[in-house]
Amino acid sequence: MKVQDMDKCAPSSDWNVLYWVLGTVLMPVALPLAIINIWQRFQAQKFRNQLPGKVVLITGASSGLGESLAHVFYRAGCRVILAARRTQELERVKKDLLALDVDPAYPPTVLPLDLAELNSIPEFVTRVLAVYNQVDILINNGGISVRADVASTAVDVDLKVMVVNYFGSVALTKALLPSMVKRGSGHICFISSVQGKFAIPQRAAYSASKHAMQAFADSLRAEVANKNINVSCVSPGYIRTQLSLNALTGSGSSYGKVDETTAKGMSPDKLAERILQCILRKEPDIIVSDVQAKIAYYLRHLCPSLYFWIMAKRAVKLENAEKKST
């Protein structure tokens, strides 16, 4: 063989060595993950066939992701309970669901709920259990957001966000948990946010409430694992909903604007389908976001100094933009 021919063969040989090394290193990890993924898909299909007739309670069901979740679970044949403050909007969602061609179809139940009124939640759960005597799947989706920096946010606003986003879901979960434990089955799904994984400027109150939700879900999951109760925590990125439009300012007034990031966010319908799969597969914790948010998540944990530097730059940029707009 000529020298030139040997040179031509060298890269191929090098690549073969590289592939062998990567295969040797990654195969022990990749193979079990692939098997787990196949098993989860099999289980998801199995449990999807068991969904018809399941009782699903969805908070924040009057619009946005909650409304999309109502459609997804209703089409799956579930007995859906719609909960939120705005009864008129819940009735609209119910009417839309009844117009769908679904078999089997159970008429949705509308029950008004204000997560900020913690003392009313035990009575709300009594009404829920009076309808179907059980809840198979609880989806803690209701919540509000804030658009303001720490210095300009009133403590009352911090408190309101924490009560609605965290304590409301905690109170509802605690009120329903005994019935799930007694039956020996149930699934509790917390709709958190990527901001429950890492914090960004001008979202302190919102991010704090989602961090608290994440911690609560993780603790609860461990405590009920031996009781046949599953706990999932879903952390989405930006979603095309009215979350920013309905957000609060630091003083507690209405923000009243749709952020560019929200407008370009993922479809709530697609996210609702992914959440259904999460519950069917009994996935404990998932992040559903674009690549940028996932990079931020890994930076926060693997290279925190760089993450903090990026966030500091972002804070200055947001502050300057706010000054120009006023």
Curated annotation (Swiss-Prot):
Record flagged with keyword Manganese: no
Lipid bilayer topology: Single-pass type II membrane protein
Listed name of the protein: Dehydrogenase/reductase SDR family protein 7-like
Binding site for substrate: S193
EC code(s) of this entry: 1.1.-.-
Subcellular compartments: Peroxisome membrane
Peroxisomal topological segments: 39-326
GO CC term (a single one): peroxisomal membrane
